[in-house]
Structures are given as C-alpha cells and as structure tokens.
C-alpha cells in the first residue's frame, strides 16, 4: 500500500498501485466515474469504468458520497487533464464506509465551520494548516536542541501568578484556590541554575474577554530562559530562531503555503537582523502616521497593526516604560524609567508574537520591585529564593505559537491557526 504522494510519480506509471483514502470529489459521465481520492499526502484522480467492473461494483463505487472511505488497486498513468497530472484506472476496490451527504459544502459560514471543526479539519486548506503548524512546533524544538537547550516541563496548576491575577482562571483544588498557568517563566527560571538553557512548549490560559482576531483563552506558549545572557543577546537568539523556523517551513511546506495563498518568497525575505526600535521612538512613529499616542500609553492591537505596516520585517520594540511592564524586568541603568525588555512585532499588521526581557537577578532590586507592585511577598517565596543562592544574570522570552503560525501562513484570524480554538464564546467541539 502506497501513499498517494508515493504512488503519483513517474516511477509508477504503467504499474499497478494500491492506495487508500477518502472521496474528495466524485462525478459520473458517459459510463465513467471520476473520483478524486485524498489522503494525508495529497490527492489523485481515479477512474472507474462501467465496462471494466461488474454492474454491482460500478453501482457501488459510483454512488459513493464525499468523505466515503475506501482502498483501491489500479494502474497508474499520466493524465494531463487531472488535478495532479496522474490518474489511476481502478481494477479492484474495497469500501470501508459509504457516506450519503457530507454536512460541509463550499458555501458554509464561519460559525458553522467552527461548530463542525471536527469535520472541517479534513479540508485541503486545513490539512495544510495542520502540516505547517506541525513544522513550526518541530522546528522550534529542533532549533533549541541544536543550541544546547534542554526541554523541560512545568505545572499547569499554580498558586502564584506571573503577571497579575485579573486574567487568571481560578480552579478549586480540593478546597484550595489555585489557577491555570499563564506562563512557565518562573518555573523555567528555577531550572537555569542546573541546566543553564531551558525551553518548554505548553498551553497557557488567559481569562481575557477579548474578541479580537488574535486572542485565544487557551493558546500554545513556547518559552525559554537562559543563564548568563542579557536582553540584547536574547533578541539575537529570537531572531535567529524565527528565521530558522521560516526556512524550515519553506523547505518542508512550500506547496502548503502556496495552497493557503502565502507567498513563500515574501517569507524568505524576513532575514535577520530585525530592526530594534525603542518604545519612545515607536511613539513618535505612531504619531507620524496619525495615531494619538503619548509616552506611557500601552500599544494595543490596533496600534501594533498600524505600526508594523511601516516595517517589512519583524521589529523589536525595546525599553518600555517601567510602569507598563511586570515587576521582574530590570530598570535600564542608563534610563531608570525604562526596563530592559523587548516585544517582537510581526509585520503585515500581525503585531506582537514575542515578549521577553532580561530578568532581575539582584535580591534587593527584586524585593524593592515586588513591594512597589504591592504583591504578597510570601506568595513568591520560592521565586525570591532564587536570588539568594547563586543568582546570575539571565534573560527569557515567551512566544505565542498560534500567533506565529497565523503570521507565517498569512491567516485572517487566529482561530484558523489552531485545530480547536477556545475563546470567550467557544468551548466546543
């Protein structure tokens, strides 16, 4: 048994091949039934001729519905009029399940397709999305393995919030209130003292009532923490990682990108170095293009979208005002009102995909910032301990994998980038 991609080659022309899959399209004309079969590797046109099969066989195969499953044996030949240039003339077949009417047609609305995502995943478009997504995740891990990082695992249920409690999902844990994790950062920081360079890929949960095209309540988060490097060096790592992923996707999923309408060559142009622009300068850029922003305003989705339209590559926005960022980011020695951080904004209006920074490693500085933020010191005792025993300079970042996938594939909505999106209005299927 061959995959459709394996069978559809010059080497098999004139030979008998066996393939299996699902009916993608079917029509009959003049005693010939044309069936396009799909599997995970592609599609191939097959023909069943009435004069070469028994009446019962022809009636069975010509009456199959979309997404009926079958295996078949036939002769492979070249056929320039077929979708792929190859065609199988069917000799034998076995039907595993015959469908009548498949619920999804070409003219279904977005909400209907979300309600039936378990079936819509079979579409050629979504098959390509899943393949590209797989390459993105695998490439992220490969990049860091090649750089000597260790993959580690952290808990999903936590008692301490990384970035405040207003958007946490609260869970009753045997009578004790705990939360679904928003970031693995603190736990990753504990591991740099043994492994030095660590990363993880895991779901994160955010109880934000956002209805934008780039927000999910459950999303895939790739995070890394590294000992002995500063904010600038962390950005070096990130831009090389992003370009490595892009190169792998182009190499392994060129046809998938084309099917999705994404120009692979436009992606290939995203070569480092990426521009690095201070927040204060970004505010100036924003006002030049007509936005009413002042220093100290946070950049929302609309501001990021308009700003990134000015750049042909991802852009790092650095040195945010201290008040806009979490307590664990250190102040810039040259300008204490700013912190040593960075956000990476994807071009073409896609906005933030990475948030990262140097981390405060000095015990006294950390304690001061915790108190300034009005946080309960006892809740962070174990995080504080890291600064008491052999603390070192270190940096880290978090990457929204679904946002990265959305940008790489040039999708309109983040819900298209993940198999089963979870939003404030959707928990099924």
UniProtKB/Swiss-Prot annotation:
Cellular compartments annotated: Cytoplasm
EC number in record: 6.1.1.22
Alphabetical keyword list: Aminoacyl-tRNA synthetase, ATP-binding, Cytoplasm, Ligase, Nucleotide-binding, Protein biosynthesis
Gene expressing this chain: asnS
Pfam family, one: tRNA-synt_2
Any GO molecular function: asparagine-tRNA ligase activity
Lineage of origin: Archaea, Methanobacteriati, Thermoplasmatota, Thermoplasmata, Thermoplasmatales
EC class (word): ligase
Source species, domain of life: Archaea
GO cellular component annotations of the record: cytoplasm
Protein name: Asparagine--tRNA ligase
GO biological process, one term: asparaginyl-tRNA aminoacylation
Annotated family: Belongs to the class-II aminoacyl-tRNA synthetase family.
Organism name: Thermoplasma volcanium (strain ATCC 51530 / DSM 4299 / JCM 9571 / NBRC 15438 / GSS1)
């Amino acid at each position: 048994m061959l995959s459709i991609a394996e069978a559809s080659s010059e080497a098999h022309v004139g030979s008998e091949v066996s393939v299996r899959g699902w009916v993608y399209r079917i029509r009959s004309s003049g005693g010939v039934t044309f069936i396009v079969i799909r599997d995970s590797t592609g599609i191939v046109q097959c023909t069943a001729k009435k004069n070469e099969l028994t009446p019962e066989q022809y009636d069975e195969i010509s009456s199959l519905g979309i997404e009926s499953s079958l295996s078949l044996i036939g002769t492979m030949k070249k056929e320039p009029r077929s979708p792929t240039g190859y065609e199988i003339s069917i000799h034998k077949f076995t039907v595993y399940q015959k469908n009548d009417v498949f619920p999804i047609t070409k003219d279904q609305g977005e909400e209907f397709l979300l309600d039936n995502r378990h079936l819509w995943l079979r579409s050629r478009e979504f098959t390509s999305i899943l393949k590209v997504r797989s390459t993105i995740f695998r490439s992220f891990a490969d990049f860091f393995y090649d750089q000597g990082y260790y993959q580690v695992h952290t808990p999903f249920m936590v008692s301490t919030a990384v970035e405040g409690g207003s958007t946490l999902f609260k869970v009753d844990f045997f009578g004790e209130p705990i939360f679904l994790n928003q970031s693995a950062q603190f736990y990753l920081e504990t591991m740099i003292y043994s492994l030095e360079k660590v990363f993880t890929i895991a779901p994160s949960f955010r109880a934000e009532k956002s209805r934008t095209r780039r927000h999910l309540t459950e999303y895939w988060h790739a995070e890394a923490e590294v000992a002995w490097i500063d904010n600038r060096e962390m950005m070096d790592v990130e831009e090389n990682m992003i370009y490595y992923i892009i190169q792998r996707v182009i190499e392994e999923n060129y046809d998938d990108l084309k099917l999705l309408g994404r120009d692979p060559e436009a992606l290939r142009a995203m070569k480092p170095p990426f521009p690095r622009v201070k927040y204060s300068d970004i505010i100036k850029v924003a006002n030049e293009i007509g936005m009413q922003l002042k220093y100290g305003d946070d950049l929302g989705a609309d501001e990021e979208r308009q700003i990134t339209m000015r750049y042909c590559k991802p852009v790092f926005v650095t040195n945010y005002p201290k008040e806009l960022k979490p307590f664990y980011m250190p102040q810039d020695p040259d300008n204490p009102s700013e912190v040593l951080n960075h956000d990476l904004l994807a071009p073409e209006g896609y906005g933030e995909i990475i948030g990262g920074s140097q981390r405060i490693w000095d015990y006294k500085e950390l304690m001061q910032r915790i108190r300034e933020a009005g946080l309960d010191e006892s809740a962070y005792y174990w995080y504080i301990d890291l600064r008491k025993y052999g603390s070192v300079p270190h940096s880290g970042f978090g990457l929204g994998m679904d946002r990265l996938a959305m940008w790489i594939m040039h999708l309109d909505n983040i819900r298209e980038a993940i198999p089963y999106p979870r939003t404030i209005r959707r928990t099924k299927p």
